[in-house]
């Protein structure tokens, strides 16, 4: 078993990180469209940005006035910076980092369950990253109701992967203080339950 950061750093070196955009683009597009449809102008952070593909895509929107990516993998951030000179990237532990200015929208795809206590990260983002009236939106494929995902921790040999139910994730948002919480599944097919999306307003 290896740490999530080491595993994803190895993915950069092997080029496997590029598959993340292909595999997750539909879910991310669904989330970003929902989160930005009523915003004329917004600031954006991608929590666990990987090689920066979401930041690059969002920053191309005329409505986005600033885009920032944060990730714990130095290899991922190095690649992100090499591909994108106009956005801001930080290599740091998400639990320790705070933006200079709070933002309108924080997005995260396939990240939160790699933390020992994701509920603390959600609370940290609520307290320190998001403006009043701002939104957190997250997507995960690794959750209790998505049976095919149950073997992933063993398959990928990752030391920390926390399995929770949809109800648990909604409670994490509620306990952090978020309001108007919504959840849905995107991309359900056969025995695949789809990406679980949870979002709320501060």
Model-derived features: where do they sit?
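Conserved class I S-adenosyl-L-methionine
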Residues: 1-37, 144-145
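Class I SAM-dependent methyltransferase SAM/SAH-binding core
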Residues: 45-96
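A conserved beta-strand element that flanks and buttresses the S-adenosyl-L-methionine
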Residues: 107
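A short glycine-rich, Lys/Arg-flanked "PGG" loop and its adjoining helix->strand segment in the class I
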Residues: 119-132
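Conserved beta-strand signature within the Rossmann-like core of class I S-adenosyl-L-methionine
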Residues: 133-141
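Short, glycine-/aromatic-enriched active-site segment of Class I SAM-dependent methyltransferases
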Residues: 141-160
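Short alpha-helix
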Residues: 161-176
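Core SAM-dependent methyltransferase catalytic element
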Residues: 185-202
């Amino acid at each position: 078993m290896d740490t999530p950061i080491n595993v994803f750093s190895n993915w950069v070196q092997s080029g496997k990180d590029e598959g993340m955009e292909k595999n997750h683009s539909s879910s991310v597009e669904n989330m970003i469209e929902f989160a930005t449809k009523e915003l004329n102008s917004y600031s954006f952070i991608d929590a666990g940005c990987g090689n920066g593909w979401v930041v690059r895509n969002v920053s191309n929107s005329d409505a986005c006035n600033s885009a920032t990516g944060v990730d714990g993998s130095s290899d991922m951030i190095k690649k992100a910076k090499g591909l994108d000179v106009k956005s801001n990237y930080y290599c740091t532990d998400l639990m320790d980092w705070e933006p200079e200015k709070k933002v309108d929208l924080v997005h995260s795809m396939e990240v939160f369950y790699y933390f020992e206590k994701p509920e603390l990260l959600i609370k940290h983002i609520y307290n320190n990253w998001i403006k009043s009236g701002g939104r957190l939106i997250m997507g995960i494929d690794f959750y209790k109701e998505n049976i095919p995902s149950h073997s992933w921790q063993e398959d990928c040999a990752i030391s920390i992967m926390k399995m929770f139910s949809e109800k648990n994730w909604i409670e994490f948002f509620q306990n952090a203080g978020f309001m108007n919480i919504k959840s849905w599944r995107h991309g359900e097919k056969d025995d695949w339950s789809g990406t679980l999306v949870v979002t709320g307003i501060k």
